[in-house]
Amino acid sequence: MHFSSCVLVSALAIVTNVATASPPPLHQLSRPALKDSTIFRSTVHCADCPEGNCYKCTLGHNNTLIANTGGMAYLRALVGFQLPVPAKKVKQCTVQFPAFVKLMEAPINITVSEAKSNDWDEDTVTGENAPDSGEPFSTSHVPALTNPPALDATEACKNAAENGDFSIYVGAQFGRFEIWSKDSGNPAILHTYYK
């Protein structure tokens, strides 16, 4: 009887270990943004834009990206990436921006939405020809006097083109922020977690 009890206890211990074992960890690869631009849409006069029309501004080589909601202007950052693995392997993606140009005095919510196309170029993209976007699929709350956290971009990653290209829009739910761009030497970084 004692031998049977030991075998039963050993078998239960093995089953318990198997049942509580952690799944294998995900692999991670990180890549910088390939392109970025502020997309400026406003009905006011913009002296630095062709014909004074804000929709015609090309801002793809500025050192910063701006997002603004409210007032007479609507600005969002458009950022393009390429997945380092096939989209079907992706479990999670985050995008990390380096820092705000100036820390925010008040909290702000940052939104991420998928651009419907990755067919744009920093030299020519404007408010008139920028790709359409979907509704925001993630929102991150940023407390006052802190930098942006890693932003969830999983939905856009999983919908990437066959070659891995995809773009996201980063915006402000209410308010305005400015972050460093690829042209400043501080590109956004895509962190891809995959199996």
UniProtKB/Swiss-Prot annotation:
Residue ranges, annotated region (Disordered): 119-141
Source domain of life: Eukaryota
A GO-annotated cellular component: extracellular region
Keywords: Glycoprotein, Secreted, Signal
Stored InterPro entries: CBM96
Sugar-modified residues: N62, N109
Primary localization: secreted
Compartments, record wording: Secreted
Pfam families, A to Z: CBM96
Range of residues in the leader sequence: 1-21
Protein name: Uncharacterized secreted protein ARB_00595
Lineage of the organism: Eukaryota, Fungi, Dikarya, Ascomycota, Pezizomycotina
